[in-house]
Regions:
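Membrane-embedded transmembrane alpha-helical bundles that form the catalytic cores
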Residues: 7-8, 12-420
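A short, hydrophobic C-terminal helix/tail in secreted or cell-surface proteins
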Residues: 2-4
Length: 421
């Protein structure tokens, strides 16, 4: 698995930057296309699935049109059967699929394409801004990336659903996670599943890693011997995930940061549990109460944000300087709405755009919060309303896109972020 991924990344990063100069035609979404192909080949090799003898059926699985540009990455035995059987057009599928497409378009055009102006403006010369605005740009990037990527996936899944095809969920409200491990089970879930199945598990249960665990037990105890081999496999997996994003040291640091933080959390889990237990006993707070949840979610978001500094910066050195500046030159008073408009007004957004961005983001997270806590599918909720209210909500969504979408003359449309992979 690791060798195949390495080969794909080598080809992509070595030759794709020069594709235009060489006059080469390259397939859209080469990484997603390659990952699905590799997954199928490895499943056949492991005898998890039967080899498909019909080349056209395999080609359909690999190149199913909605997903090929930016995923989600499908597992053969979960998707292939749906593609090979007949589907009749059903009103329920058309309605639910169209609602998901509309929701994705709203996130992309109203939030992501507007927010990217702030990010580009600050990241063009990040050292010219105070640490406050570097941090603010990183927060905006976290929101923009989520809106852009999840919006694109919603459009893909919605189109497939209209044809009666159910594709894997790729996001599950990741910014409500209480730990970095939980975040990676909620973010880009199909990539996470792929890496666990074809990189992490083969490494962690390999003979070398199992023998390493046996060697550790008499020297460092049961906990370390049980956890450390898996932690090392996890770090290697995150390095692969990081480098998959590009042949740049900043992506290596991105992978290392996530892998090492998760490794430390696992290694020190018993200590953390005792400390947390003592704190809750002393204060009388509940471990899963509102206060503990808010603190855990905010702390996790800050850990996520540190990783994003390496993603957003031009290079690793700039990322470290940005992190240092965010800590040493941060002034909360600069985050007032008037100061934001004054300092970031040249990014191409006016006061109306910034206020609209804030309001729409808050509305988006309110809906996500309701879905998360009530275990509610908003599409089912809308379609269960009486006809007048149902269509009022749908038309409201359409009008929001038409009126508040960031497009038109003078606007440079932003590609989906993950199209570059």
């Amino acid at each position: 698995g690791v060798r195949l991924v390495g080969s794909e990344m080598c080809i992509r990063d070595r030759y794709i930057p020069y594709a235009g100069e060489l006059g080469l035609l390259l397939p859209l979404g080469i990484s997603f296309y390659t990952f699905q192909s590799m997954g199928y080949v490895m499943d056949v090799y492991r005898e998890i699935v039967e080899p498909e003898k019909n080349f056209l059926k395999v080609a359909l699985f690999v190149s199913f049109f909605p997903q090929i540009i930016q995923g989600p990455i499908a597992i053969y035995d979960k998707l292939a059967g749906q593609l090979y059987e007949g589907h009749s057009l059903r009103l329920e599928n058309l309605q639910k699929g169209a609602l998901l497409v509309l929701w994705g378009v709203m996130k992309k055009l109203v939030i992501a394409d507007r927010a990217v102006n702030i990010i580009n403006f600050v990241m063009d010369k990040p050292m010219d801004f105070s640490g406050t605005y570097v941090f603010f740009a990183a927060v905006v990037y976290a929101l923009q990336l989520y809106a852009d990527f999840s919006g694109g996936i919603d459009i893909v899944r919605g189109i497939a659903e209209m044809f009666g095809i159910t594709m894997s969920t790729n996001f599950n409200h990741p910014y409500f996670s209480r730990s970095l491990t939980e975040y990676w089970h909620r973010w880009h879930m199909t990539l996470g599943d792929w890496c666990r199945n074809y990189i992490f598990y083969p490494l962690s249960i390999s003979k070398r890693f199992l023998n390493f665990g046996k060697w550790l037990k008499p020297r460092f105890g049961a906990h370390i011997s049980k956890v450390l081999p898996g932690c090392i496999a996890s770090v290697i997996t995150f390095i692969v995930i990081g480098v998959w994003h590009g042949a740049n040291m900043k992506y290596l640091y991105f992978g290392l940061w996530n892998g090492i933080v998760i490794m430390l959390a696992e290694l020190f889990a018993p200590v953390n549990k005792k400390v947390a237990g003592g704190f809750f006993k002393l204060t009388g707070l509940r471990e899963k109460g509102i206060f503990a949840t808010i603190v855990s979610v905010l702390w996790t978001f800050m850990l996520i944000l540190v990783g994003y500094y390496f993603d957003i910066a031009a290079n690793a050195s700039t990322a470290f300087h940005m992190l240092f500046k965010s800590v040493t030159d941060f002034h909360i008073s600069e985050l007032g709405i008037n100061n934001i408009i004054l300092n970031l007004g040249a990014c191409g957004l006016d006061e109306y755009d910034i206020l609209l961005l804030i309001i729409c983001t808050l509305l988006w997270f309110f809906i996500s919060f309701v879905e998360e806590n009530k275990k509610l599918d908003m599409r089912d909720f809308i379609l269960s309303r009486k006809l007048p209210l149902r269509w009022a909500i749908i038309y409201l969504g359409i009008f929001i896109v038409i009126i508040f979408g960031y497009y038109g003359p003078g606007v440079n449309p932003a590609d989906f972020v993950y199209m570059q992979f």
